[in-house]
């Protein structure tokens, strides 16, 4: 095998060439095995959802389940009074597959059903592993699979939508908590009420959390039980498909927060002990249980598990029209330790034999499959260790993700706000942090996501303003803490979004500084949705200051989108001075200037730029965004020649930059 581009692009990886090539060869060998040496495609292999589970046929129904440890399986449901009848007994076929064919009148759309699985020494009720619809009884809270075969099913149109990744601007959202009311929101409400807000705000992609069915609402969707079922607490499959189609009509891509890093422990609702075999889907021994998440870890070395998970990826793309995935918990998959207690200080930590090569192989195959099914699909890795090659091309020796989350950035901002007084905020440190990434891998930059909004943590705006958000967000209050918070909120988001090399992400409501943390209904809060909703009335009320942040956010995105391939343009630092707390950098014809100094405004502060005329296109101090309006944004700024820099073709751009403000200028001539 020739030297891979991953190593050519980073000479520091040369000592680990054998390990990198070994992982790459593992992927090639596994792909050859699964595709019968290329006689079929990965997409052909990943079509299990068309075979397993319940399907309507021309003359009735057919149901199949993989349960090699079972001795007997019955379908029970509302159609047979939940009794084990011979008529509903499955027959064992080859390779641990069980099958039953039923006449058309044996069940109907809307019927509830489960399996009763028998094995040596026991039996139990189970929801089918490939169930595409699972519902919960309002009174008993019991989950059951549901026959889903409407007379007029929603047909997903042939794929013509092409996501706009120039740049990718992601709105992270959750269907259930997207509404104003103290309740669980629905797909229809999101489509009718929330999508228009997102489109107006300027985002071109939504990343939806908690789609795969999960027994406990408060898990935020991360303890999945039924991997092929769209959560029924939000509505029907048809309603989710219509939501996605409507988003496409608005120019918005839809990606799913997919959970393949672990599964819920539940045995009746989930896969935990499907047919009396606790290791049917999961690793044996100590590796079966995740020590931190109270969940189960898939056995990525088992072909049947790879088949299940790859089919799951293809299912959501083909059956619902999703445009891709954000893979949750990738760090947990990559390492035997799940990354817990690891520092990841040097490259040796990525190639020391503590990595799960089976999981690495699965993730790489998943990326190959997803892009085979849809070449325009988007894949994003949530990964905190910094594993090299994660978002590099497979043929270059990488794992094939399109993007990786820049998880260092929100950590940096929270640490800065928590631990440093304003006078100690260092622009050199900020710039290094937001641009600290591998040159051959694209990232999704973000100041905060849902992680920072969860109960026990605080959003950026709440850390900045805290209790004053309850009393002083009205216009005219002139509260110092509020004014400071809004100013820094705008500056932090501008610095984060304007230095992207791939995309930018915002969590639902944070664009306008949504107050308080997220606390899902649970026994400890009386099962209330009060803190698991979005208070849109705050941003809609023009007597409050929330809309200043939302208006700035929208114009910030407009500025970014006005530059073709903005994310691909070099970020060139012009100046930083930690004493003054001033930072300036350029992208194409745009100059970004920040003054983080809390007290000192600067007159005629000079920056060396290419000669020309510069005009203000965005200013955090604009009164329209809650600023003080200390500068005239209509003034044109002409550069001043200096013989010292004539050879470098640079001239001085001199500006008045008020304290705690940022401005974006465009070279117009």
Language-model-detected regions and their locations in the chain:
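Conserved alpha/beta catalytic core and glycan-binding cleft of carbohydrate-active enzymes
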Residues: 321-323, 341-529, 561-606, 613, ...
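Conserved, mostly hydrophobic/aromatic
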Residues: 65, 115, 173, 198, ...
């Amino acid at each position: 095998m020739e030297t891979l581009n991953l190593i050519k692009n980073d000479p520091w990886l040369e000592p680990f060439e054998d390990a990198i090539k070994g992982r790459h060869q593992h992927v090639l060998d596994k792909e050859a095995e699964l595709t019968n040496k290329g006689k079929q495609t990965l997409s052909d292999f990943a079509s299990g959802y068309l075979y397993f589970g319940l399907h309507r046929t021309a003359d009735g129904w057919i149901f199949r389940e993989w349960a090699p440890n079972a001795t007997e399986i019955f379908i029970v449901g509302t159609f047979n009074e939940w009794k084990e009848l011979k008529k509903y007994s499955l027959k064992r076929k080859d390779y641990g597959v069980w099958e039953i064919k039923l006449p058309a009148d044996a069940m109907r759309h809307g019927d509830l059903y489960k399996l009763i699985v028998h094995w040596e020494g026991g039996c139990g009720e189970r929801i089918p592993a490939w169930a595409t619809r699972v519902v919960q009884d309002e009174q008993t809270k019991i989950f059951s699979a549901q026959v889903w075969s409407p007379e007029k099913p929603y047909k997903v149109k042939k794929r013509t939508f092409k996501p706009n990744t120039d740049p990718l601007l992601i709105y992270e959202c959750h269907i259930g908590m997207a509404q104003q009311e103290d309740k669980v929101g629905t797909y229809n409400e999101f489509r009718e009420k929330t999508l228009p807000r997102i489109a107006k705000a300027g985002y071109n992609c939504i990343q939806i959390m908690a789609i795969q069915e999960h027994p406990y609402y408060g898990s935020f969707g991360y303890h999945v039980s039924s991997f092929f079922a769209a959560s029924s607490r939000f509505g029907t499959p048809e309603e989710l498909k219509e939501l996605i189609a409507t988003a496409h009509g608005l120019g918005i891509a839809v990606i799913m927060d997919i959970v393949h890093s672990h599964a819920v422990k539940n045995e009746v609702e989930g896969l935990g002990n499907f047919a009396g075999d606790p290791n049917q889907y999961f690793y044996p021994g100590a590796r079966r249980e995740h020590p931190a998440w109270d969940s189960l870890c898939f056995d990525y070395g088992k072909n049947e598990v790879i088949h299940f998970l790859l089919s799951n990826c293809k299912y959501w793309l083909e059956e619902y029209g999703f445009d891709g995935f954000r893979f949750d918990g990738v760090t947990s998959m990559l390492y035997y330790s799940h990354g817990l207690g690891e520092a990841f200080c040097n490259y040796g930590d990525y190639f020391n034999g503590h990595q799960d090569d089976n999981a690495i192989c699965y993730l790489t195959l998943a990326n190959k499959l997803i892009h085979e099914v849809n070449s325009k699909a988007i894949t994003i890795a949530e990964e905190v260790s910094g594993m090299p090659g994660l978002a590099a091309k497979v043929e270059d020796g990488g794992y094939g993700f399109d993007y990786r989350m820049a998880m260092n950035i929100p950590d940096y901002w929270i640490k800065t706000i928590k631990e440093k007084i304003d006078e100690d905020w260092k622009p050199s440190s900020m710039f290094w942090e937001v641009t600290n990434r591998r040159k051959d891998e694209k990232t999704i930059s973000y100041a905060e996501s849902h992680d920072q909004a969860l109960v026990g943590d605080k959003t950026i705006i709440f850390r900045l303003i805290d209790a004053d958000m309850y009393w002083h967000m009205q216009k005219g209050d002139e509260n110092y803490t509020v004014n400071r918070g809004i100013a820094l909120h705008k500056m932090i988001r501008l610095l984060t979004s304007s230095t992207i090399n791939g995309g930018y992400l915002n969590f639902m409501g944070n664009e306008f500084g949504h107050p308080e943390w997220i606390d899902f209904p649970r026994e400890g809060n009386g099962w209330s949705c009060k803190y698991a909703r979005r208070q849109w009335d705050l941003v809609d009320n023009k007597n409050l200051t929330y809309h200043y942040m939302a208006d700035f956010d929208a114009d910030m995105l407009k500025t970014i989108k006005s530059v073709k391939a903005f994310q691909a343009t070099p970020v060139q630092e012009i100046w930083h001075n930690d004493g003054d707390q001033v930072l300036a950098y350029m992208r194409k014809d745009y100059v970004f200037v920040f003054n983080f100094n809390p007290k000192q405004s600067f007159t005629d502060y000079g920056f060396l730029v290419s000669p020309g005329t510069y005009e203000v296109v965005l200013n955090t101090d604009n009164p329209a965004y809650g600023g003080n309006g200390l500068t005239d944004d209509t003034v044109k700024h002409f550069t001043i020649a200096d013989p010292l820099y004539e050879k470098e073709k640079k001239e001085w751009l001199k500006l008045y930059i008020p304290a705690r403000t940022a401005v974006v200028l465009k070279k117009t001539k």
